[in-house]
Amino acid sequence: MYVFKRIYHATHPDMMEGVDNETLRQRYLIDGLFQPGQIVLNYTHYERFVIGGAAPHGGAVRLPDQTEPESAAGHPFLERRELGVVNVADVAGTVTVDGQAYALAPKDCLYVPMGTKDVTFEGDGARFYLVSTPAHARFETRHLSIADAVPLERGGLETSNERTIYQLVVPATCKSAQLLMGLTILKTGSVWNTMPPHLHDRRSEVYFYFDLGKDDRVFHFMGEPDKARHIIMANEEAVVSPPWSIHMGSGTSNYAFIWAMGGENLDYTDMRVLDICQLK
């Protein structure tokens, strides 16, 4: 059986003009990531991201080997890839990397390097969000908690966007080939993320929204700055942001989200900040 649930092809901004909401969702929204007792993986042609979820139930689940092409079948999934893992549940879980077990508390992150042969996930109730990018070099496995992150305080309650950005997989804390990854938590009373918005033409980004209530939603804005569109997102759903697209959102309550980037450099500040008045 093919290892990926879905493949997301890259799109030119012209292709998105005039499309309906369902088409927009089909192109960029990644849902259904957590299925009990399974690992779900999706392949995107944006920086060759693989976006997935592991939801162990009644035993361990293992990151599958490659299945295609025939020349790679049976080879480890991370033969030429690196992996970021975040426990997005409210209970702890365990990730075992080539025989070494790492206990991940809620919101803990694990960086797993290229060349790792075996990765398993355990813990009833734990849900592990997975992000993988191609890699050219092997670095060290790193277990990172919020206490290990570089915290950036941004926004304010008066503008409804007071938040803490926790930089997890960044050069200051964890060496990687191209993966950048972090966690943003909005304070009570704040609903806007990534304000003001920005673009970064040299990398793609994926947002994963979580800690949302069952009846809450995030309105995620994307598209070219003068042709903004939105996708309404529920808890524990991801969305791909192409290099040409803005990416920001507003929720019906506060929430958290994981951002992950891949591209030609590891410079977190490589972006073009926009003025909100430029958006249409």
From Swiss-Prot:
Taxonomic superkingdom: Bacteria
GO MF terms held by the record: 4-deoxy-L-threo-5-hexosulose-uronate ketol-isomerase activity; zinc ion binding
Reaction catalysis annotation: 5-dehydro-4-deoxy-D-glucuronate = 3-deoxy-D-glycero-2,5-hexodiulosonate
Keyword Isomerase: yes
Keyword field contains Hydrolase: no
Annotated Zn(2+) binding sites: 198, 200, 205, 247
Annotated pathway: Glycan metabolism; pectin degradation; 2-dehydro-3-deoxy-D-gluconate from pectin: step 4/5
BP GO annotations: D-galacturonate catabolic process; D-glucuronate catabolic process; pectin catabolic process
SUPFAM superfamilies membership: RmlC-like cupins
Cofactors: Zn(2+)
Enzyme class: isomerase
Keywords: Isomerase, Metal-binding, Zinc
Pfam families: KduI
Cofactor details (free text): Binds 1 zinc ion per subunit.
Enzyme Commission number: 5.3.1.17
NCBIfam families for this protein: PRK00924.1 (NF002091)
Similarity comment: family membership: Belongs to the KduI family.
Annotated function: Catalyzes the isomerization of 5-dehydro-4-deoxy-D-glucuronate to 3-deoxy-D-glycero-2,5-hexodiulosonate.
Protein name: 4-deoxy-L-threo-5-hexosulose-uronate ketol-isomerase
Gene name for this UniProt entry: kduI
